[in-house]
Amino acid sequence: MGERGVEDKSAVQESATELEAGIGYRFVNRQFLAEALTHRSWVNERRGEEGIRDNERLEFLGDAVLGLLVGKMLFARFPQSREGVLARMKASLVGEETLAALASARGLGRHLLLGRGEERSGGRERRSLLANTYEALLAAVYLDGGLGPVERIVEQDFSPLLAGIASGATGRDFKTEFQEMVQTRFGTAPTYELIATDGPPHDRRFTVIAMVAGKRMGEGAGRSKKEAEQAAARQVLARFAAEGEG
């Protein structure tokens, strides 16, 4: 490998530790990570060199792994939703725009190996390229460590998004509905208090209680505070409905 290749390989190794810390997973075989970050434009500039592969095969596998895990999350969190609704939610969650945003949030663009032309044309910020790299990274983690580590990453990234689409999935925004009910009945607004934060930094789980005039009304948990608040509001509404007070 030429001098530029050695420098590029070294750069990948140096950035690997930073990237691993960000996703909460340390690779046993960093070759999987290096391949996930290698765009075909970089490979095309080094035709004839041995052992260089782009990330397109990993992208293919990552798409399947991501689809499985997001489907599993939707199936568990929206037990009353029918297949068509779940399919639409899944399509919106794993679309290019969402994946590119997640890749940008994790800073994947700056870790990429790109050819000169791709670099000059702004490839590090190109949405399609970032989305593909996100899928390739998930596949790399899967091949290196199995489904468990990938599921933790996907839960971390997608749980806040699931909370955001909860109203679209059910036709209800539980926090807003709860607030309107409380204002009508009690002339005040509910409040939420965070009572527990569990798990490592890359896999937090929040527990909150919903209160009205200082009285505890319900409790909910989620991967984000917003999701936990929605869960708490939903619990209160469900209880009121069961008691015939909805």
Swiss-Prot record:
Start and end residues of each DRBM domain: 173-242
Chain residues that bind Mg(2+): 59, 132, 135
GO CC annotation terms, alphabetical: cytoplasm
Cofactor(s) demanded: Mg(2+)
Stretches assigned to the RNase III domain: 16-146
Catalyzed reactions per annotation: Endonucleolytic cleavage to 5'-phosphomonoester
The keyword RNA-binding appears for this protein: yes
Keywords: Cytoplasm, Endonuclease, Hydrolase, Magnesium, Metal-binding, mRNA processing, Nuclease, RNA-binding, rRNA processing, rRNA-binding, tRNA processing
Coiled coil: none
GO molecular function, one term: ribonuclease III activity
Subunit structure: Homodimer.
Function noted in UniProt: Digests double-stranded RNA. Involved in the processing of primary rRNA transcript to yield the immediate precursors to the large and small rRNAs (23S and 16S). Processes some mRNAs, and tRNAs when they are encoded in the rRNA operon. Processes pre-crRNA and tracrRNA of type II CRISPR loci if present in the organism.
Annotated protein name in UniProt: Ribonuclease 3
Source organism per UniProt: Geobacter metallireducens (strain ATCC 53774 / DSM 7210 / GS-15)
